[in-house]
């Protein structure tokens, strides 16, 4: 499918198409305020209590923490394929982002490596969370390959408060608002151009399963306690590092993730994503509960104009955004376009959609990494 329209005309076309879809559905409900929060997507085990809000994230620091041994924390380490050496203190210094593989991305500008200049020592570089490659992690956002206009609009939404989290405890939403307000327009543009210059490449392996490893949560990220799968998946998606030491301990941007998804969710998600959930009952076509995703995101779900690609991205992130939009936590200019898409979706629908979308662009078979969705 070619993109023949100016971005503004394309957005108008999408709006008309979605309105037509809503009319075809008959009606949509108001956002499902009573739909239970997918706690796993936000990295929590229990719902927020009244008045709960995010604790501010500590600024980057190289100081030793209680009970840390100096020699262990300052010992230089390496990862396979890299000529660089860094200590654990270097790894966690978000104001001076480490770079294992400079050949994998453009030259990092100060906003990427060090953060907003106006924040001084309190700043953290974009790559401290999203990594130099922009692939992000399950607890934050994959920002590589985003259209420039979309990227800039998200920063503006964080600045204005139009982009928030449906779970008020999510700390990096608060951090993003602080950083966005401190960034100059030039820094925003440089960050958008940096991440937008890189095409998205997948690194999440989807596995359908009834059982998952027992996990613990650190910084809203699930980490496996054991390799054996003994815990029922219970309708969740559990996204964990392929190698905890590489991904978490060393922030290796080549070490990806596994997304355990319920058996059958990829196939069910395919129907929701490609048709909106249309079915045939007694020979009659029954319209589904949503609108096909390619209406806006393109036939391969890799984006169109200033609408972002979603194929192959973190399922935890995808579910958070769908739920945030459903609950009205995202109020930016694009949010109204998504309302008819998410209004009637329940938790199982969100899981199925994310499982399928992530499985569309499997990571390459490399060093034992799998290449797509499968039941294991």
Where are the regions that the model predicts?
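Bacterial N-terminal signal peptides
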Residues: 14-27
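Sec/Tat signal peptide C-region and signal peptidase I cleavage site
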Residues: 28-33
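Residue-level detector of short, conserved catalytic/binding motifs and their immediate flanks
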Residues: 124-127, 141
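Short, cysteine/histidine-rich loop/knuckle motifs that typically chelate Zn2+
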Residues: 128, 295
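A structural feature that tracks compact, well-ordered secondary-structure segments
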Residues: 131-132, 138-146, 152-163, 177-181, ...
